[in-house]
């Protein structure tokens, strides 16, 4: 479960970076690479509105997923040292003679 959420978290982060870089800025951002500089006013507003909504949705999903990952990873799990100590306590001392 934790691995799946971690994969989803990384995927959301990559998508969020791409969407943020595609948004228009003073120099048109990366969207000008695909010929976005010649768009009409209506299509430019539509694309900008879509990218803004996508950014908000992806950022919200990123935040929610980060909180879930933090909660899952903070749950108490027995660590390796306690498992080793438990095994050592349960072992029989082999140096003692055994009566037959």
Swiss-Prot record:
Keywords: Cell membrane, Membrane, Protein transport, Translocation, Transmembrane, Transmembrane helix, Transport. It is found in: Cell membrane. This is Protein-export membrane protein SecG. It is a multi-pass membrane protein. Involved in protein export. Participates in an early event of protein translocation. The chain crosses the membrane at residues 1-21, 54-74. Belongs to the SecG family. It comes from Rickettsia bellii (strain RML369-C). GO terms for biological process: intracellular protein transmembrane transport; protein secretion; protein transport by the Sec complex. One of its GO terms (cellular component) is plasma membrane. GO terms for molecular function: protein-transporting ATPase activity. InterPro entries: SecG (IPR004692). The gene is secG. It comes from the Bacteria.
């Amino acid at each position: 479960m934790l691995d799946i959420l971690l994969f989803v978290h990384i995927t959301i982060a990559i998508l969020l970076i791409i969407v943020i870089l595609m948004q228009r800025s003073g120099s048109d951002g990366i969207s000008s690479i695909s010929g976005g500089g010649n768009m009409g006013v209506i299509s430019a507003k539509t694309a900008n509105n879509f990218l803004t909504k996508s950014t908000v949705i992806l950022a919200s999903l990123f935040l929610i997923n980060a909180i879930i990952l933090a909660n899952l990873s903070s749950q108490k799990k027995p660590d390796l040292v306690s498992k080793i100590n438990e095994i050592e306590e349960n072992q029989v001392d082999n140096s003692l003679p055994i009566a037959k």
